[in-house]
């Protein structure tokens, strides 16, 4: 009789050990079990002697889920941190289910949105739903796991050695490039022409209303009452994105005209050619200002000035 009892206990011990080994073998390097429907029902069956932390998510590239993209590396860091501190026999199992591979499992739990972070306590199939609106960082998730299990682990993020080596090599290449081209770089950054061009571009960009539209999130254009496409807002208090582009183009044309008249015209050889050059760019300048003044008049009906238009 004692022999059969001993044999029964030994058989139970062997089965338990094999069950643990089987579960451990399905754990990846991060300490996460990539589950399918059948495997999850084997893990959470109401008889488990461990806590199951489950993340139900979806591939962010196919589902366009920004939160999924953020939480997945944090969940891996969470599982890896517990694995480093407690090993695989910590009494906590971290499982991950992807929607694309577990549609039936998602239907079984009536999951209609992702991600979902659930905790199943030992001997229970009732999930504890965790609200993710307060954050999805590994530290925040670890605090939740500690609350329900009493175990905590300091979060340790894995260092991607390939990225570190790549970054180091990039720094070396950039440093070498800067060293061998230092004379050219110095000439560029000490050139008056370069700084003049940068200054002109900055002034035109800011004075055309670019920052105004960026701060107010102005639309590019707008439909009028009769379905026409309006690119010019009839008010000084508002501006469309298309209007910024038109005004910037006008400012650029006027600036180039002024530069040609001030710098290039005196260097033109021959009195007749120089006179013709000046007349052409003066006409261009006059026409450009006419369009600019017309825009001012359209935005403010009481604007008193007018040129050609």
Curated annotation (Swiss-Prot):
GO cellular component annotations, sorted alphabetically? endoplasmic reticulum; oligosaccharyltransferase complex
Q: List the disulfide bonds.
A: 65-68
Q: Which Pfam families match?
A: OST3_OST6
Annotated metabolic or biological route of this protein: Protein modification; protein glycosylation
Name its cellular compartments: Endoplasmic reticulum membrane
| InterPro entries documented for this protein | OligosaccharylTrfase_OST3/OST6, Thioredoxin-like_sf
Principal localization reads endoplasmic reticulum
| Biological process terms in GO annotation | protein N-linked glycosylation via asparagine
Question: Which membrane topology describes this protein?
Answer: Multi-pass membrane protein
Q: Which domain of life is it from?
A: Eukaryota
Leader peptide range in chain numbering? 1-19
Keyword annotations of the record: Disulfide bond, Endoplasmic reticulum, Membrane, Signal, Transmembrane, Transmembrane helix
Cite the Thioredoxin domain residue spans from the record: 29-150
Query: Does Transmembrane count among this protein's keywords?
Result: yes
> Which residue ranges traverse the bilayer?
165-185, 193-213, 246-266, 276-296
Listed under subunit, the entry gives: Component of the oligosaccharyltransferase (OST) complex.
Q: State the function annotated in the UniProt record.
A: Subunit of the oligosaccharyl transferase (OST) complex that catalyzes the initial transfer of a defined glycan (Glc(3)Man(9)GlcNAc(2) in eukaryotes) from the lipid carrier dolichol-pyrophosphate to an asparagine residue within an Asn-X-Ser/Thr consensus motif in nascent polypeptide chains, the first step in protein N-glycosylation. N-glycosylation occurs cotranslationally and the complex associates with the Sec61 complex at the channel-forming translocon complex that mediates protein translocation across the endoplasmic reticulum (ER). All subunits are required for a maximal enzyme activity.
Q: Which family does it belong to?
A: Belongs to the OST3/OST6 family.
> By what name is this protein known?
Dolichyl-diphosphooligosaccharide--protein glycosyltransferase subunit 3
């Amino acid at each position: 009789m004692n022999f059969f009892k001993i044999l029964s206990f030994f058989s139970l011990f062997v089965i338990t050990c094999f069950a643990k080994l089987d579960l451990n073998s399905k754990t990846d390097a991060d300490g996460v079990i990539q589950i399918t429907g059948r495997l999850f029902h084997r893990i959470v069956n109401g008889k488990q002697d461990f806590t199951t932390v489950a993340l139900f998510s979806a591939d962010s590239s196919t589902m366009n889920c920004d939160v999924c993209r953020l939480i997945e590396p944090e969940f891996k860091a969470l599982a890896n941190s517990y694995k480093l501190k407690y090993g695989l026999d910590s009494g906590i199992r971290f499982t991950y289910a992807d929607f694309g591979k577990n549609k039936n499992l998602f239907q079984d739990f009536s999951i209609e949105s992702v991600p979902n972070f659930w905790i199943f306590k030992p001997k229970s199939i009732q999930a504890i739903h965790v609200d993710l609106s307060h954050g999805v960082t590994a530290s925040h998730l670890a605090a939740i796991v500690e609350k329900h299990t009493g175990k905590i682990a300091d979060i340790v993020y894995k260092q991607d050695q390939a990225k570190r080596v790549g970054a180091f090599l990039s720094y070396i290449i950039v440093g070498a490039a800067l060293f061998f081209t230092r004379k050219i770089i110095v000439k560029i950054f000490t050139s008056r022409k370069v700084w003049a061009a940068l200054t002109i571009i900055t002034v035109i960009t800011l004075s055309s209303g670019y920052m105004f539209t960026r701060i107010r999130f102005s639309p590019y254009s707008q439909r009028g009452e009769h379905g026409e496409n309006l690119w010019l807002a009839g008010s000084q208090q508002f501006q469309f994105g298309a209007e910024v582009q038109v005004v910037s183009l006008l400012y650029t044309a006027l600036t180039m005209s002024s530069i040609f008249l001030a710098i290039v015209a005196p260097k033109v050889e021959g009195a007749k050619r120089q006179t013709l050059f000046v007349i052409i760019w003066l006409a261009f300048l006059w026409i450009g200002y006419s369009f600019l003044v017309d825009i001012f008049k359209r935005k403010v009906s009481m604007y008193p000035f007018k040129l050609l238009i």
